[in-house]
From Swiss-Prot:
Residues 79-110 are mitochondrial matrix. It catalyses: a quinol + 2 Fe(III)-[cytochrome c](out) = a quinone + 2 Fe(II)-[cytochrome c](out) + 2 H(+)(out). Proteolytic processing is necessary for the correct insertion of UQCRFS1 in the complex III dimer. Several fragments are generated during UQCRFS1 insertion, most probably due to the endogenous matrix-processing peptidase (MPP) activity of the 2 core protein subunits UQCRC1/QCR1 and UQCRC2/QCR2, which are homologous to the 2 mitochondrial-processing peptidase (MPP) subunits beta-MPP and alpha-MPP respectively. The action of the protease is also necessary for the clearance of the UQCRFS1 fragments. The chain crosses the membrane at residues 111-137. This is Cytochrome b-c1 complex subunit Rieske, mitochondrial. Its EC number is 7.1.1.8. Gene3D superfamilies: Cytochrome Bc1 Complex, Chain I (2.10.210.10), Rieske [2Fe-2S] iron-sulphur domain (2.102.10.10), Ubiquinol cytochrome reductase, transmembrane domain (1.20.5.270). Its cofactor is [2Fe-2S] cluster. Coiled coil: none annotated. GO terms for molecular function: 2 iron, 2 sulfur cluster binding; metal ion binding; protein-containing complex binding; ubiquinol-cytochrome-c reductase activity. Keywords: 2Fe-2S, Disulfide bond, Electron transport, Iron, Iron-sulfur, Membrane, Metal-binding, Mitochondrion, Mitochondrion inner membrane, Respiratory chain, Transit peptide, Translocase, Transmembrane, Transmembrane helix, Transport. The Rieske protein is a high potential 2Fe-2S protein.
Amino acid sequence: MLSVAARSGPFAPVLSATSRGVAGALRPLLQGAVPAASEPPVLDVKRPFLCRESLSGQAAARPLVATVGLNVPASVRFSHTDVKVPDFSDYRRAEVLDSTKSSKESSEARKGFSYLVTATTTVGVAYAAKNVVSQFVSSMSASADVLAMSKIEIKLSDIPEGKNMAFKWRGKPLFVRHRTKKEIDQEAAVEVSQLRDPQHDLDRVKKPEWVILIGVCTHLGCVPIANAGDFGGYYCPCHGSHYDASGRIRKGPAPLNLEVPAYEFTSDDVVVVG
């Protein structure tokens, strides 16, 4: 009887007294055997409904699969209708909020605004970086008290006759002039009573052939030009002050003569200023 039922092909399940099920690759929705009746699960009201633990307790132990075609599974996805879709309108510009309107019309204005913000930020960052670098470099320089006590030694043989040489001393320009015999006689012959800041030439020099001055105009602090002006001494291009070869003010708005620093000759060829 069993052999006849086995050879009957499609009628084997009808002729057979027993049936058997073969597990497939997918778990069917219905089991071959009728499961025992069980009580429906009761939801614990103390737990929040929309949480991972509660959802995993209500869902099946394994993902539910329904066979739609030949070996084609379809998974079951839990859909939540209470999830709010984020709105990014606050981060978008007003010109591009309307999705039905072309953004090409406002592209130039939006690009111009972006370029303006970028340029402004770049200038601000560059200015801040300049200040930081300046402070860093200035911190490595000598302090004010060191500069105030500093001295400079000048070799006079390097300055030819009739020429003026400029040096930097205590952060200021220092003029050392090698005067000719003509300049010495010319400045010595000037009437002191005609000067705005009366001072004789011999009172401003220790050696007639050497004039040592601080090259800062007494008007507003500009640096005069040597061997220029109406009197052949120094000329301030800022406001037109004229000084003679002794550094005395002769014409223009400057009220005083050029300052003479403290100096001494250590030898016939060397002078120390400071």
